């Protein structure tokens, strides 16, 4: 059994590939997410709310079920129409997940660098998590 302090879901997140989509500044980005815990993790949704690296919420139906120590890939359509060389700090992927029957939010902070070709490249800098309802405010 894991200690109480490690009850939070733990993941890694990596950008795998990026392809241009129809329309200026639209990209199809493939991500790899890995469950670092010894229990399953269900991914229900992800969104990217930053204005310079943005997508609508993507609901996973059915949920992406990651067994212990397993990884999976998913795609998100992102709008990023920034000039070459621009670095966007504090962009986020915000996941809605369930672990051991409890809802959590996982915040993956990424740094996005726009290459000379205009292609956005995201590097994960920090991943934090927050249990839904911890503050007494319902979801």
Language model: regions and residue ranges:
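Asparagine-centered strand-capping/turn motif at beta-strand->loop junctions
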Residues: 31-40
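Structural beta-strand segments of beta-rich domains
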Residues: 25-31
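Terminal connector regions
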Residues: 81-126
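Acidic, serine/threonine- and proline-rich intrinsically disordered appendage/tail regions
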Residues: 2-7, 19-25, 109-139
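Short, solvent-exposed beta-strand/turn "edge" segments of beta-rich domains on protein surfaces
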Residues: 15-25, 65-67, 82-86
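Intrinsically disordered, low-complexity Pro/Gly/Ser/Thr-rich segments with frequent PxxP/GP/PP motifs
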Residues: 56-84
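Short beta-strand and strand-turn-strand segments in soluble, beta-rich domains
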Residues: 10, 49-62
């Amino acid at each position: 059994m894991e200690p109480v302090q490690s009850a939070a879901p733990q993941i890694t997140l990596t950008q795998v590939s990026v392809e241009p989509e129809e329309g200026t500044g639209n990209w199809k980005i493939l991500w790899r997410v890995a469950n670092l815990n010894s229990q399953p993790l269900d991914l229900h949704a992800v969104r990217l709310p930053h204005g310079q690296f943005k997508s609508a919420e993507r609901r996973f139906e059915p949920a992406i079920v990651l067994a212990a120590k397993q990884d999976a890939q998913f795609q998100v359509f992102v709008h990023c129409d920034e000039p070459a060389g621009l670095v966007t700090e504090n962009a986020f992927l915000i996941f809605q997940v369930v672990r051991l029957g409890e809802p959590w939010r996982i915040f993956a902070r990424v740094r996005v660098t726009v290459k000379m070709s205009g292609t956005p490249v995201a590097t994960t800098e920090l991943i934090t998590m927050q249990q839904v309802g911890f503050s007494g405010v319902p979801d």
